[in-house]
Amino acid sequence: IKTDLGKAYLKAYGAYYNLPAALQGETALGEDETRNIKGVCPDGWHIPSQKEWQTLSKYVLDSGMAAIMNDGQVDETAIAKALASTTMWMLPEYTEIEPQPTWVGVEMEKNNATLFNGLPIGFRACAGDEDWMHSCYSAGWWSSTAGVQMGPEFGITVRLWSDLHTFVTNAEFN
């Protein structure tokens, strides 16, 4: 890390990786594959597959932890709110529609029903300049499944997933 900004992001959010760096030479999973890809994760942990992310989303919905929109509907923002930390989130500077109660930057005390504690990490463009994008109002983590992630020119963080298929909410693993 060469700059003070980069060092600050590392301290607050952890390392940002492009996909090849995150996978550490392993081949991304095919759609129906179920093996764990360790990549940059320590022993006992792996990069979650798209199926594991979908299982988490289904759990949030089925358990009633997702927030409800003004019209009574539940959408992907309702799932995000249940996974988002209760601090650091902001609304984008410009929005075309009225903010909904499901948005993570609205009524943040209602965020994090799951204790997942997702931080607004944004992402980084890796094509030369140190360009940090959408921090404070977006989050995303790599999937080990091919074809569902951002391009290799972007850097985002890795969310550790236990090989024991348990969720850890301890701040040490955030």
What residue ranges belong to the model's regions?
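Conserved positions within compact, well-structured domain cores
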Residues: 1-174
